[in-house]
Curated annotation (Swiss-Prot):
Keywords: Coiled coil, Ion channel, Ion transport, Membrane, Potassium, Potassium channel, Potassium transport, Transmembrane, Transmembrane helix, Transport. Disruption phenotype: No significant effects on the uptake of the K(+) congener 86Rb(+) by parasites. No significant effects on survival of infected mice. No significant effects on oocyst development in the midgut of Anopheles stephensi mosquitoes. This is Potassium channel K2. It is found in: Membrane. The lineage of its organism: Eukaryota, Sar, Alveolata, Apicomplexa, Aconoidasida. Gene3D superfamilies: 1.10.287.70. Residues 1141-1185 form a coiled coil. Residues 814-823 have a biased composition (Basic residues). The keyword Transcription regulation does not apply.
Amino acid sequence: MKTEFLSINDIFFLVKIGFKYVLALFNGFYLIKIVSYPNEHSIITNKMIYIGIGILLKIILIIIYWIYFMDIYILKKNCNKKFFGNIYCNSNKIIDNNISTTIIESDDFEYKKLIKKFFLKKMYYSLKKGHKIVKLYMLKIYNSDFNCYFCNTRDILYAIIWYISLYYWRRDEYNILWSFNKIPIYIYNILLILLSSSYIDLVMIIISYNKSKYHMMKSKLLIDVFFSSPSAFFFSRHFFVLENGIDIYFLMGFLRIIKVFLNVSYAKTEQSYILTNTEIKVIRIILGVLLLCNAFASTLYTIQGIHPYNIDNHDLYYILNNYLDYFYFSIISISTVGYGDIIPTNKLSRVICIFFIFWTFIWVPIQFNDLIISIFCKKETYGKLSMNNQKLILLIGDIQPEQLNTFFFESVAYGNKLKFHILTTYPINLYEEQIKIADNYCISIYIKNFDLNEKHNTNLLYSVNAQNAYYMFLFSNKFNNGHYNIDTKSFTRLLILAKFLHGEKKNAVIELRNKCVSNIVKSIGCEHFAIVNLKHSLIVKNLVCPGFITFLSNLFTAYNYNENPYYFNNSKYLHSFNFIAEFNKGSIAKIFSFAAHDNMIGLNFDKLFYKLYESLGILLIGIESSHINNNHFVYSNKKRLNFFFENVGRSMIKGNGIRDRTRKTGKIGGHKKFKFKLVYLCFLKRYIHSLSRDNCDNTQMITILNCKKNNSKMNKLNKKFYLKEIPNLLEMLNNHVHLTNKSNLSTPTWNNGIKESYKEKNIKSYHYIIDTNNINVAYKNNIPEKGKKDRGGIYIGNKHTNDTCARTNESHKNNRLRSRRSQNGKPYLGILKNCNNELFHTKKMNNYYESYRNNSNINEISIPNKRNGKPKCYLNLLGKNYFMKENDKCIVLANSKKVINYLSKAKSLFWLFEINSTKMDKVTYDLKSIIKTKQYFNKIPTSNLVKNIPIMPHMKNKSIISKHDSKIIPMDYYDLFNAYKSFRVFPQINYGITKNMLRVSYKENFNNDINNNRSIGDRSNSNSFSKLGMDKSTLSLTKFSNENSHMDSNSNDNYTVNYEHSDQAFFKGCVNWGGCNNGNTNIRENAQNEVYSINDVMNSVIKMEADKYTFEVNLNDTILVENDYNVLQKNNIKNFASIKKSNKNSNNNNKCEQIKQLNNNLTFKKNEKKTKSNKQNTNDTLERRKNGVAYSYLDACQKYFAHSAKNKKLLLLINYASNIIQLVKLINKTCKYNIIILTSEISSINIHHIYNVAFIKCKTMDDYSLLNAGLLQAEYILILPTEVNDINEINEIDMNNIILTRKITYLLKKKKKNYFINNIITELINPTNIIFLEENNMIKMTEKKSSYSDFFPYINSTQFYSSNIISETMLYNFMAHHKSFTKFPVSNSTLKCLIKDINIIYVCELRKYSDFSFKKIKTFRDLFFFLSKKCIIAIALYRKGDKYVPFYIYTKPCENCLIRFDDIVYVL
């Protein structure tokens, strides 16, 4: 039972504390008592003044150290309990504010809770708390390096004062005491100052005795205790009987010489940046022996030396001779020579001789042993461990020297004094160059050669102080990176590290070579980098966005570019100075993130964006947040039926011609209205580009409810439209548009973007689930207009989804609907055969239906979303009405100095948000015509342009239109504008069908439909399209024309095209909704009796050899249909017929005749196909077992690329790597290329039929081999390094690639007039080898040390300012940068967003045309402001230089940089 009285332990603790403080006061009392002895030279007052000066000097130095150097936990007395509670809640992510939280204090301040009703207990615990704080302060200060340097300096000064005082010592015989009466007063005053400062050190030792027990037993501390005031008073009063007590410090001054020797013997040498470890050991031995002999001589001189009173004229000469004799005697005695000319005169001298000789015998051999070991033994360690609180970075695994350079560079560039502990499997001599770099740049390192994976010994981690690591990095071996066991080793090291930390959260990053164990690593809670996938993503992104590698390396590398001196040694580089200087000026901007300040919380993102930019030149590009957005945007419209369609249509087609034309017909209800809606929805599908599967998220739905319809007329407009934004802010949406019946689904048809279902009759209600992500992408490459209203005065509520906002934390694999789709985006066959309600009525969909059934008057549909605690990256929130919240982090592009000087201080931004800045005058820009043209061009597919648009002269080798890619390359805006004006008529034609249109379709059970009196041409009466599919073996193609509205029924010239089964594994077909003009159609025949489309705007029928044709299908513009021939045969599907829209006066009999003729052709070709199928299947089976090997580029085109599109670009890959399949897969996923691999070895894996790849084998990479492989026809050339089996092969392989790069550069310049050096992508292993890529001469490293140019030269240090050079080592900037080297780190999701989700806008040659004017927009700043008004953030310019600086990146929009008309603007 607790009582109010103290226990025995408490009383003992109070006594111990009291004794410490009394002992400290006791020392001060005797210091005053010593100086208060009668002295004729000074008075007590003067002595007290000098003592006060010494104490004050020590206190000032402690305060300076406390302010600038000490980092310790301070418990403030006036701290608010609520403040600490909030901190604890935030750290543990506790949302409920009602939960009472307990303050968890540091281990240094753990004490029992105060019991308020017991007064003595309260007083005791308050005293104990205060004492622990004082003790912690004293211990921290005493053990610091700052105090050590001060004490050593004081000891040296003490020794100098003692040697000066020897001149004034007097005595006639050695058996009497020395007289110190002739010592001047200034020596006494200096001695008093030194004694008073040492008194403070002794007080710190006394108070922090328990924590400094390791320092108490040292010999240096024993000397300090002997020189304390009580011991000095005791020896001076009772042992030596001195008149002046302070004279004892002169008499025993030789002990200070011994302390100086001890300081040198055990001094720290880990931070020596001038000498090597061996040199330091040699110097320590020499200096130690000299100091030891000097201490021996000083002790003997004090014991048996004499200096008579009568020698006054030659005092200095006499004292020097006398002291030199004793120094000579000490050397003779220590070396055991013993000449006998000088001998000890008394017993005390003999005892001193024995003591020093033994001391020498022990100390000198130990030092020589360490020296021999360091010279001759194999080095397993280098450097010394960091025992203080310096920031420690631990690197574990197979770290290469170049990777270590990256970490060194980041540390030096940010000015951080970091200590690196390296636990590596490589020998230490491999890091000789890195050790020199560390010595030159004052980087403290410790290297140990040991593999953590061998013995699984966690004690090894204790030996390198892993428990004190600020950040930890684990590396994998890059050699033989195709094997699985490499990541297994790294994963095993991670498990050992996790076991060592005992669940404690540490900042750890692991490098992986593949994604085999990435999910397991993620479950452990460790951040990981799949370095190979990151490299492949950069390469593929650079194919679409030129200069992207250089741009991203500028943002993530702390490199301050300077004009390299070797550029101006030759006069030919002088004219490139402007380009180099502009690049250096624009490359200052780096990417940072900082916590939102209190003044920023609650501000709109747009307002904060303009405030930071206008005042500080800081570009805010996004936020990192873990909050749930509580802003719900709910819109309803009860009056207008086609609210959704009008908004989407107007965003895509100017004027909404379809809606106006439908109004003019006067038939809004009934079959006509529903047919319009249905056809219009399919029309929208054709022009809405879907996002990739990696960016899918089910977050936003538009739900249209209660759509009732009769057979003839539609009921009143009683629909409700809801636009719902669920809590996760602006997440990427699922690229599906679903149209599903509320009741049973029947005869579904899979579409690329839409799911349609019909009931036979009496369809009363429909349930539309339309994913707005499809609309989102339609805006993707456009410039939206903020706050624009449609013609009906309805605000377009989904404008907030216009810009690209990325989130990469959630995977599409959780989407059950998406998991049913194949990898290439096409549906599986089983989906077409077995499509039922379960496909869409998943668990999440059932929640929507239940909420609808339970509440008919529902206004909002809540979609549950699990909270994810990890920070998410949101880019470009302009126009989203996002308000800054607490704990948000702002992602900015800025100069590091601005971020540190302004954003890291609490009160520096007060004026920025409190004072209203003057608004700039609104300026009207003439660029609106360009923006509108760009909008409508992107919204209308490029494949619908009838005339071929010419391109710029330097882009002649590039195709303007890529049907499998939504990206648009630089183009001629003048012809684009003319095409746009002529294309304004497009919406007035029936749903996008122009004159010459290729129609392919079929009808199931056509005779049954005739018996039921249903016309296939009249969609208003047709509600049953059972299934759409294409025969893989044979396809009937018909050509329709609007020129002659007549069909010759007697004509036998109905041609079909055989699409053989052996040509391709499956058939890609195109079925378009819509119809032709009124009347019958005529089948046209060309001169060669071949049927194909001329200037076809929807499909391309491409002529190939042997009268074979294929479709080139735009996946975004067509309905992909595929089915098995056997399935169609079972369903009696043998007829292919055209689906044509006709008016009411059309004749159904003509349609029947057309279909009969087509069926006859189909039957004939079907029989012909059976005779050839067996032979073709046998040959096809044999060919598939072989890989695609060709002898030349032309041979590859004939054999393997014959069925691909003519406008497909060629990608030439040189050298074969083990992970090249992953790269090819990623390239084909993003941009479709015909790929030729030029290599000396052929892969055993057949990848031709999957990725359209052909191999060309060659022994040497000579000029003929390169030209034969299609070098001149290649759009991009990618040079990969060959397999590296040993680290010594790195430079050899890099040199081969560098020579090959220069050879390709020479060939392209010789053969091509318009040559882009940026189209060559070279991957190097060692980034420092890039200095040899200089075109005309090798670069010699400058003797003068420039700022980092020699240290880290791989980024843009040569004339290849923007050449596509990439290295795995360069990617370690993303691993190191913003993790442990800066106070403003960026999360890993931001990096992924920048690599995968960035888009570009091209601005080319606008000054040549009168339609566009840049009178108001002249600089990058003007263009930045104009685009920001359109919710677009411009972040960089990619521009052309001259012959020596071909291309470079400019990333500083705050400067008045004049824009040029051939610049490419990077935007978010």
